[in-house]
Amino acid sequence: MSFLDSYRKKTLMPSTDEALPGRAQPIPTSATHFVNSRPLKEPWPEGYKQVLFGMGCFWGAERLFWQVPGVYVTAVGYAGGVTPNPTYEETCTGLTGHAEVVLVVYDPKVVSLDELLTLFWEEHDPTQGMRQGNDIGTTYRSVIYTFDKADRDVAEKSREAYSQALAGRGLGPITTEIEDAPELYYAEDYHQQYLAKNPNGYCGLRGTGVSCPIPLAQ
Protein backbone atom coordinates (compact mmCIF):
# COMPACT_ATOMS: atom_id res chain seq x y z
CA MET A 1 0.00 0.00 0.00
CA SER A 2 1.37 3.41 -0.99
CA PHE A 3 1.68 6.29 1.47
CA LEU A 4 -1.17 8.07 -0.30
CA ASP A 5 -3.42 5.01 -0.06
CA SER A 6 -2.57 4.61 3.62
CA TYR A 7 -3.33 8.30 4.25
CA ARG A 8 -6.68 8.05 2.51
CA LYS A 9 -7.63 4.93 4.47
CA LYS A 10 -6.85 6.58 7.81
CA THR A 11 -8.79 9.73 6.96
CA LEU A 12 -12.04 8.13 5.79
CA MET A 13 -14.80 7.32 8.26
CA PRO A 14 -15.58 3.58 8.21
CA SER A 15 -19.05 2.33 7.37
CA THR A 16 -20.94 0.16 9.83
CA ASP A 17 -19.92 -2.89 7.82
CA GLU A 18 -16.25 -1.88 7.80
CA ALA A 19 -16.01 -0.95 11.49
CA LEU A 20 -14.43 -3.29 14.01
CA PRO A 21 -16.96 -5.21 16.15
CA GLY A 22 -15.65 -4.13 19.55
CA ARG A 23 -17.08 -5.79 22.63
CA ALA A 24 -20.05 -5.72 24.99
CA GLN A 25 -18.11 -4.95 28.16
CA PRO A 26 -16.28 -1.67 28.87
CA ILE A 27 -12.50 -1.88 28.98
CA PRO A 28 -10.95 -1.43 32.45
CA THR A 29 -10.01 2.12 33.38
CA SER A 30 -9.26 4.32 36.38
CA ALA A 31 -11.88 5.03 39.02
CA THR A 32 -10.37 8.35 40.11
CA HIS A 33 -8.41 11.26 38.65
CA PHE A 34 -4.63 10.90 39.07
CA VAL A 35 -4.19 14.61 39.83
CA ASN A 36 -7.15 15.52 42.04
CA SER A 37 -8.47 12.09 43.14
CA ARG A 38 -12.04 12.91 42.10
CA PRO A 39 -14.22 10.20 40.50
CA LEU A 40 -14.01 9.94 36.71
CA LYS A 41 -17.61 8.86 36.28
CA GLU A 42 -21.04 10.20 37.24
CA PRO A 43 -22.83 11.29 39.33
CA TRP A 44 -21.37 14.81 39.29
CA PRO A 45 -22.06 17.50 41.89
CA GLU A 46 -25.46 19.15 41.44
CA GLY A 47 -25.46 21.96 38.89
CA TYR A 48 -22.20 20.94 37.22
CA LYS A 49 -22.08 20.62 33.43
CA GLN A 50 -20.08 18.56 30.96
CA VAL A 51 -18.75 18.81 27.42
CA LEU A 52 -16.58 16.63 25.18
CA PHE A 53 -13.70 18.15 23.20
CA GLY A 54 -11.60 16.48 20.51
CA MET A 55 -8.52 18.41 19.43
CA GLY A 56 -5.97 15.83 18.34
CA CYS A 57 -4.06 13.62 20.76
CA PHE A 58 -6.03 13.58 23.99
CA TRP A 59 -3.00 13.62 26.30
CA GLY A 60 -2.20 17.30 25.88
CA ALA A 61 -5.82 18.31 25.51
CA GLU A 62 -6.72 16.77 28.86
CA ARG A 63 -3.86 18.54 30.66
CA LEU A 64 -4.98 21.85 29.16
CA PHE A 65 -8.40 21.57 30.77
CA TRP A 66 -7.65 19.96 34.14
CA GLN A 67 -5.60 23.05 35.02
CA VAL A 68 -8.53 25.45 34.50
CA PRO A 69 -10.08 26.84 37.72
CA GLY A 70 -13.68 25.68 37.89
CA VAL A 71 -13.05 22.40 36.08
CA TYR A 72 -14.05 19.63 38.47
CA VAL A 73 -12.61 16.64 36.65
CA THR A 74 -11.38 15.50 33.25
CA ALA A 75 -11.10 12.10 31.59
CA VAL A 76 -10.11 10.83 28.16
CA GLY A 77 -11.95 8.45 25.92
CA TYR A 78 -13.32 7.65 22.50
CA ALA A 79 -16.55 8.97 20.98
CA GLY A 80 -18.35 9.72 17.74
CA GLY A 81 -17.76 6.41 15.99
CA VAL A 82 -19.29 2.99 15.53
CA THR A 83 -17.32 0.37 17.47
CA PRO A 84 -18.60 -0.27 21.03
CA ASN A 85 -16.04 -0.24 23.85
CA PRO A 86 -12.97 0.09 21.60
CA THR A 87 -9.37 -0.25 22.71
CA TYR A 88 -6.70 2.33 21.93
CA GLU A 89 -5.10 -0.04 19.45
CA GLU A 90 -8.42 -0.46 17.66
CA THR A 91 -9.01 3.29 17.38
CA CYS A 92 -5.53 3.71 15.88
CA THR A 93 -6.53 1.52 12.92
CA GLY A 94 -9.12 4.09 11.85
CA LEU A 95 -11.73 1.34 11.78
CA THR A 96 -13.78 2.41 14.79
CA GLY A 97 -14.77 5.89 13.61
CA HIS A 98 -14.12 7.33 17.06
CA ALA A 99 -12.29 10.55 17.86
CA GLU A 100 -9.99 10.89 20.85
CA VAL A 101 -11.90 13.17 23.23
CA VAL A 102 -11.60 14.82 26.62
CA LEU A 103 -14.55 14.87 29.00
CA VAL A 104 -14.59 18.20 30.85
CA VAL A 105 -16.86 18.45 33.89
CA TYR A 106 -17.08 21.98 35.23
CA ASP A 107 -18.85 24.35 37.60
CA PRO A 108 -20.58 26.96 35.39
CA LYS A 109 -20.60 29.38 38.33
CA VAL A 110 -16.80 29.48 38.16
CA VAL A 111 -15.93 28.92 34.49
CA SER A 112 -18.25 29.40 31.52
CA LEU A 113 -18.62 27.27 28.42
CA ASP A 114 -17.50 30.30 26.41
CA GLU A 115 -14.23 30.36 28.35
CA LEU A 116 -13.68 26.66 27.73
CA LEU A 117 -14.49 27.11 24.05
CA THR A 118 -11.97 29.94 23.79
CA LEU A 119 -9.27 27.55 25.03
CA PHE A 120 -10.49 24.88 22.64
CA TRP A 121 -10.32 27.13 19.56
CA GLU A 122 -7.04 28.82 20.41
CA GLU A 123 -5.02 25.78 21.49
CA HIS A 124 -5.36 23.62 18.36
CA ASP A 125 -5.84 24.08 14.61
CA PRO A 126 -9.52 23.42 13.78
CA THR A 127 -8.94 23.70 10.01
CA GLN A 128 -7.03 20.46 9.44
CA GLY A 129 -9.83 17.96 8.86
CA MET A 130 -8.88 14.39 9.73
CA ARG A 131 -5.56 15.26 11.33
CA GLN A 132 -3.85 17.49 13.86
CA GLY A 133 -0.28 18.31 12.91
CA ASN A 134 1.66 15.10 12.37
CA ASP A 135 -1.13 13.02 13.93
CA ILE A 136 -3.15 11.78 10.97
CA GLY A 137 -6.48 9.96 10.97
CA THR A 138 -10.14 10.24 11.89
CA THR A 139 -9.27 9.70 15.55
CA TYR A 140 -7.52 13.10 15.61
CA ARG A 141 -10.33 15.17 14.12
CA SER A 142 -11.61 18.33 15.80
CA VAL A 143 -14.96 17.82 17.58
CA ILE A 144 -17.25 19.40 20.15
CA TYR A 145 -19.97 17.19 21.62
CA THR A 146 -22.53 18.94 23.85
CA PHE A 147 -25.12 17.60 26.27
CA ASP A 148 -28.02 20.00 25.63
CA LYS A 149 -29.34 22.27 22.89
CA ALA A 150 -28.38 25.49 24.66
CA ASP A 151 -24.74 24.42 24.85
CA ARG A 152 -24.78 23.28 21.24
CA ASP A 153 -26.06 26.71 20.20
CA VAL A 154 -23.25 28.35 22.18
CA ALA A 155 -20.69 26.09 20.51
CA GLU A 156 -22.04 26.79 17.03
CA LYS A 157 -21.99 30.56 17.62
CA SER A 158 -18.41 30.31 18.83
CA ARG A 159 -17.46 28.40 15.68
CA GLU A 160 -18.95 31.16 13.55
CA ALA A 161 -17.06 33.83 15.49
CA TYR A 162 -13.75 32.01 15.26
CA SER A 163 -14.30 31.23 11.59
CA GLN A 164 -14.54 34.95 10.90
CA ALA A 165 -11.37 35.59 12.92
CA LEU A 166 -9.49 32.93 10.96
CA ALA A 167 -10.77 34.22 7.64
CA GLY A 168 -9.47 37.66 8.54
CA ARG A 169 -6.00 36.10 8.73
CA GLY A 170 -6.39 34.11 5.53
CA LEU A 171 -7.03 30.82 7.33
CA GLY A 172 -9.87 28.32 7.29
CA PRO A 173 -12.40 26.95 6.79
CA ILE A 174 -13.09 25.32 10.14
CA THR A 175 -13.69 21.56 9.94
CA THR A 176 -14.75 21.06 13.57
CA GLU A 177 -17.71 18.71 14.03
CA ILE A 178 -20.34 19.94 16.52
CA GLU A 179 -22.94 17.36 17.52
CA ASP A 180 -25.06 16.15 20.41
CA ALA A 181 -22.89 14.06 22.70
CA PRO A 182 -22.74 10.39 21.70
CA GLU A 183 -21.79 7.64 24.11
CA LEU A 184 -18.36 8.13 25.66
CA TYR A 185 -16.14 5.07 25.93
CA TYR A 186 -13.49 5.70 28.57
CA ALA A 187 -9.89 5.07 27.52
CA GLU A 188 -7.54 2.71 29.29
CA ASP A 189 -6.06 3.57 32.68
CA TYR A 190 -2.62 4.47 31.32
CA HIS A 191 -4.12 7.18 29.08
CA GLN A 192 -5.96 8.91 31.92
CA GLN A 193 -4.04 12.06 32.98
CA TYR A 194 -1.12 10.70 30.95
CA LEU A 195 1.00 13.86 31.12
CA ALA A 196 0.74 13.99 34.91
CA LYS A 197 2.09 10.44 35.04
CA ASN A 198 4.62 11.14 32.26
CA PRO A 199 5.55 14.86 32.46
CA ASN A 200 7.94 14.63 29.49
CA GLY A 201 5.45 12.77 27.32
CA TYR A 202 4.23 13.80 23.89
CA CYS A 203 1.95 16.84 23.57
CA GLY A 204 0.89 17.75 20.04
CA LEU A 205 -1.20 20.84 20.82
CA ARG A 206 -0.45 23.66 18.37
CA GLY A 207 -2.77 26.60 17.85
CA THR A 208 -3.10 28.87 14.83
CA GLY A 209 -1.98 31.97 16.71
CA VAL A 210 -5.36 33.60 16.08
CA SER A 211 -7.21 34.86 19.16
CA CYS A 212 -10.82 33.81 19.63
CA PRO A 213 -13.21 36.80 19.74
CA ILE A 214 -15.92 35.17 21.87
CA PRO A 215 -17.24 37.78 24.33
CA LEU A 216 -16.80 36.32 27.81
CA ALA A 217 -19.37 36.76 30.55
CA GLN A 218 -18.30 39.14 33.29
From Swiss-Prot:
It is an enzyme of class 1 (oxidoreductase). GO terms for molecular function: L-methionine-(S)-S-oxide reductase activity; peptide-methionine (S)-S-oxide reductase activity. Its EC number is 1.8.4.11. Induction: Induced by phenol and 4-chlorophenol but not by hydrogen peroxide. Keywords: Oxidoreductase. GO terms for cellular component: cytoplasm. One of its GO terms (biological process) is cellular response to oxidative stress. It catalyses: L-methionyl-[protein] + [thioredoxin]-disulfide + H2O = L-methionyl-(S)-S-oxide-[protein] + [thioredoxin]-dithiol; [thioredoxin]-disulfide + L-methionine + H2O = L-methionine (S)-S-oxide + [thioredoxin]-dithiol. SUPFAM superfamilies: Peptide methionine sulfoxide reductase. The active site is at C57. Active on the S and R isomers of MetO. PANTHER family: MITOCHONDRIAL PEPTIDE METHIONINE SULFOXIDE REDUCTASE. Has an important function as a repair enzyme for proteins that have been inactivated by oxidation. Catalyzes the reversible oxidation-reduction of methionine sulfoxide in proteins to methionine. Belongs to the MsrA Met sulfoxide reductase family. This is Peptide methionine sulfoxide reductase MsrA. It comes from Brucella anthropi.
